[in-house]
C-alpha cells in the first residue's frame, strides 16, 4: 500500500476566496463581459472557469473599452494603473487582498516619513510591481532585493533612514535570512510592526515542513506562476525531499512514484480543492497500474484557519482622485 498524506491547511486562502467571489458577483450582477486586470489569482483552472462565465483577463488597460467595468486582481496595482483606469472612466471593483493593501499602507506611511524603503520580493511579480508603485519615483526612493547577496550590493542614500517591507507570499525562511542581512548591514533599519508574509503562506509552509518528516515525495498542486506554490516546493526540497508541482492531475508522472512508500500532497493558496481530488484519483490509478497497490489517504491535523475578508460594496467605484 502507498500511504498518501494530505497537508493541512492547503488550498484557497481568504484573499483568494474573496477575489474569486468579487468576479463572480460582478458577473452575476452586471453580466458579461467583466474585465479583469491580470489573472485574478494565479491558477489556470480558476482563470479558465471564470473565462467561461464571461470574465475577460487583460494585462493592459488599453484592451478595456472606456467606461467598462474592471476588476483589479488580488495582487494589487500601482497608483499609475489607478490613474490610467480613472482617465479611461473605468468602473472598478478592487479585489486586492487586504493583506497586500496592508503593505501598501505601510509603504505610504514610510514614504510620508521620508524613509528610503527596501522591498524584499521577486522581480516581475505583480504584487511587487503594485507595491513598488505606491510611491512616485520622482518623490521617494524604493529598492528591491531578493537575496542576502542583493543586500550586500545595495547602495542607499542614507543608512540611518531605512525601512523595509516584504512580498506577502515569500518563503518564510528565505525572507528571515534577507531581513537578518538587512539588519546586519543597516542596524537602524526598521520594519513593519507585524510581519508582511501572510498567515496562509506561513501556515502552508509549516504544513509542508510537517509533511517532509513523514514522506519521501511531495506533490504541490499549483500553477507555475504562483509564487506561494513555488515556495512550497522549495520548502520540501530544502529538506532534501523530492518535490514536484502540477497544474493538473495529468501532469503527475508515473516515474515519480517508483519506490515511494509515502507521498505528501498540498496545494498553493490559489489552487482549488477539486484539483487535489483529481490528483488523488490519478495517484490511485498509477498505483494500481504499477503494482496493483492500493492507496491509503490520511489527512494530517493542522492549523484551523477562520480568517475571512469582507467584500467591497456592491457598486463599482471610480478613482477620480488619481486623475
UniProtKB/Swiss-Prot annotation:
Pathway listed? Isoprenoid biosynthesis; dimethylallyl diphosphate biosynthesis; dimethylallyl diphosphate from (2E)-4-hydroxy-3-methylbutenyl diphosphate: step 1/1; Isoprenoid biosynthesis; isopentenyl diphosphate biosynthesis via DXP pathway; isopentenyl diphosphate from 1-deoxy-D-xylulose 5-phosphate: step 6/6
Which UniProt key words apply to this protein? 4Fe-4S, Iron, Iron-sulfur, Isoprene biosynthesis, Metal-binding, Oxidoreductase
An annotated Gene Ontology molecular function:
4 iron, 4 sulfur cluster binding
Q: Which reaction does it catalyse?
A: isopentenyl diphosphate + 2 oxidized [2Fe-2S]-[ferredoxin] + H2O = (2E)-4-hydroxy-3-methylbut-2-enyl diphosphate + 2 reduced [2Fe-2S]-[ferredoxin] + 2 H(+); dimethylallyl diphosphate + 2 oxidized [2Fe-2S]-[ferredoxin] + H2O = (2E)-4-hydroxy-3-methylbut-2-enyl diphosphate + 2 reduced [2Fe-2S]-[ferredoxin] + 2 H(+)
| EC number of the protein | 1.17.7.4
Gene name per UniProt: ispH
What InterPro entries does the annotation carry?
A: LytB/IspH
Q: Which organism is it from?
A: Nitrosomonas europaea (strain ATCC 19718 / CIP 103999 / KCTC 2705 / NBRC 14298)
> What positions does the entry give for dimethylallyl diphosphate binding?
42, 75, 125, 226-228, 270
Identify its protein family: Belongs to the IspH family.
Active site, UniProt feature = 127 (proton donor)
Q: Which HAMAP family match?
A: IspH
Instruction: Specify the protein name.
Output: 4-hydroxy-3-methylbut-2-enyl diphosphate reductase
Task: Write out the residues that bind [4Fe-4S] cluster.
Answer: 13, 97, 198
Q: What is the lineage of its organism?
A: Bacteria, Pseudomonadati, Pseudomonadota, Betaproteobacteria, Nitrosomonadales
- GO BP terms in the entry: dimethylallyl diphosphate biosynthetic process; isopentenyl diphosphate biosynthetic process, methylerythritol 4-phosphate pathway; terpenoid biosynthetic process
Q: Which residues bind (2E)-4-hydroxy-3-methylbut-2-enyl diphosphate?
A: 42, 75, 125, 168, 226-228, 270
Q: Which cofactors does this gene product need?
A: [4Fe-4S] cluster
Q: How is the cofactor bound, as the UniProt entry phrases it?
A: Binds 1 [4Fe-4S] cluster per subunit.
- Residues reported to bind isopentenyl diphosphate: 42, 75, 125, 226-228, 270
Q: What the protein does?
A: Catalyzes the conversion of 1-hydroxy-2-methyl-2-(E)-butenyl 4-diphosphate (HMBPP) into a mixture of isopentenyl diphosphate (IPP) and dimethylallyl diphosphate (DMAPP). Acts in the terminal step of the DOXP/MEP pathway for isoprenoid precursor biosynthesis.
Amino acid at each position: 500500500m502507498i500511504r498518501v498524506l494530505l497537508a493541512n491547511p492547503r488550498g484557497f486562502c481568504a484573499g483568494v476566496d474573496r477575489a474569486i467571489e468579487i468576479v463572480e458577483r460582478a458577473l452575476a450582477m452586471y453580466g458579461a463581459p467583466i474585465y479583469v486586470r491580470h489573472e485574478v489569482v494565479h491558477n489556470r483552472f480558476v482563470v479558465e472557469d471564470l473565462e467561461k462565465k464571461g470574465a475577460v483577463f487583460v494585462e493592459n488597460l488599453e484592451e478595456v473599452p472606456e467606461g467598462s467595468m474592471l476588476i483589479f486582481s488580488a495582487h494589487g496595482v500601482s497608483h499609475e494603473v489607478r490613474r490610467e483606469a480613472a482617465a479611461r472612466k473605468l468602473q472598478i471593483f478592487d479585489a486586492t487582498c487586504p493583506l497586500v493593501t496592508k503593505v501598501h499602507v505601510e509603504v505610504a506611511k514610510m514614504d510620508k516619513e521620508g524613509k528610503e524603503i527596501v522591498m524584499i520580493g521577486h522581480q516581475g511579480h505583480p504584487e511587487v510591481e503594485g507595491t513598488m508603485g505606491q510611491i512616485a519615483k520622482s518623490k521617494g526612493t524604493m529598492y528591491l532585493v531578493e537575496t542576502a547577496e542583493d543586500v550586500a550590493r545595495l547602495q542607499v542614500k542614507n543608512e540611518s533612514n531605512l525601512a523595509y517591507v516584504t512580498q506577502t507570499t515569500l518563503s518564510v525562511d528565505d525572507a528571515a535570512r534577507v531581513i537578518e542581512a538587512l539588519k546586519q548591514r543597516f542596524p537602524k533599519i526598521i520594519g513593519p510592526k507585524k510581519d508582511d508574509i501572510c498567515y496562509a503562506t506561513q501556515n502552508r509552509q509549516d504544513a509542508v515542513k510537517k509533511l517532509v518528516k513523514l514522506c519521501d515525495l511531495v506533490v504541490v498542486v499549483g500553477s507555475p506562476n504562483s509564487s506561494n506554490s513555488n515556495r512550497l516546493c522549495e520548502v520540501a526540497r530544502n529538506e532534501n525531499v523530492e518535490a514536484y508541482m502540477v497544474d493538473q492531475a495529468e501532469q503527475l508522472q508515473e516515474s515519480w512514484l517508483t519506490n515511494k512508500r509515502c507521498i505528501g500532497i498540498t496545494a498553493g493558496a490559489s489552487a482549488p480543492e477539486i484539483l487535489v481530488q483529481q490528483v488523488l484519483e490519478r495517484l490511485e490509478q498509477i498505483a494500481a497500474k504499477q503494482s496493483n497497490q492500493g492507496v491509503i489517504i490520511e489527512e494530517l491535523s493542522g492549523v484551523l484557519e477562520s480568517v475571512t475578508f469582507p467584500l467591497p460594496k456592491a457598486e463599482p467605484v471610480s478613482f477620480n482622485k488619481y486623475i
